[in-house]
Amino acid sequence: MPQWIRNSPLPAIQLALLILSAYFLVYRPSILTGALFILLLIRLFQQYGKKSALKVLPILMVFLALFSGHALKMKWEEERIPSSISQLSLRPDSIRINGDQLSFQGRSNGRNYQVFYKLKSQEEQAYFQNLQDLVILTVEAEISLPEEARNFNGFDYRAYLRTKEIYALVKVTEIQEIKARSSWNPMDWIFLGRRKALLHIARSFPSPMRHYMTGLLFGDLDKDFEEMEGIYSSLGIIHLFALSGMQVGFFIDKLRYLLLRLGLKRETVDRLQIPFSILYAGLTGLS
């Protein structure tokens, strides 16, 4: 456990609650989140006294500064969205096809975009359905901001995309050219490997087995699953298709067991868990 947590006068769970309230104060500012944060601070002073509470405040200030800096960065990114775009690097594992509608995540000039395109032919549809390469698209496109929640407590699409570091939508009107691209970014190759694995499972296994595999192993559920979601929900097995911390913990525990059985030292296994966790996060699409 980090030293600053061990030295905190608060139990870890209570410290986490304070940090969580600071997070919502910055990212979801409202009378409710502000009142909750103030109430927790009052309880902190009442329960632990001034001396102990003052030891916790620097930790809270650090997290408030980090959250505020990130929130300002997001606002700055939204204000700097370009008016036009001509090339997009396609992230292959994000491809979704619904009828003649194609969507995917793309990157251009260091920025991420959520991209939409109406397929012009069955050949185009088949190409993107089977795409297993890193490609760059030359396009004609329009850029817009995602919609915010229209109703109280409604779904905020803009806030959702912010969690993925996406600040703008791109509507492609024409794809002029598709070229293969190379990349030295290891995440590109992890995402490509994820795409190949998803396609292999989709072609090799029937429903609902492939939904189990893609959902539990890779955190991905396609359009076919959405059509069956109501049935799975009524049967009470919808949770079996969701990737959760329990499954991640299971895979990491099994990796530790295997490496320890192979004779590796515990310290070495602890170090290997870090790159494995990063690799697995990429294979789940950072979901």
Positions of PLM-derived features:
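Short N-terminal signal/transit or membrane-insertion segments
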Residues: 36-39, 99-104, 273
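Helix-loop-helix junctions and helix-breaking kinks within/between transmembrane helices
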Residues: 23-34, 128-131, 283-287
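N-terminal leader/targeting segments
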Residues: 1-80, 169, 179
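Hydrophobic alpha-helical transmembrane segments in multi-pass membrane proteins
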Residues: 18, 30-31, 40-59, 170, ...
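Membrane-interface helix/helix-cap signal primarily in integral membrane proteins
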Residues: 2-4, 66-239
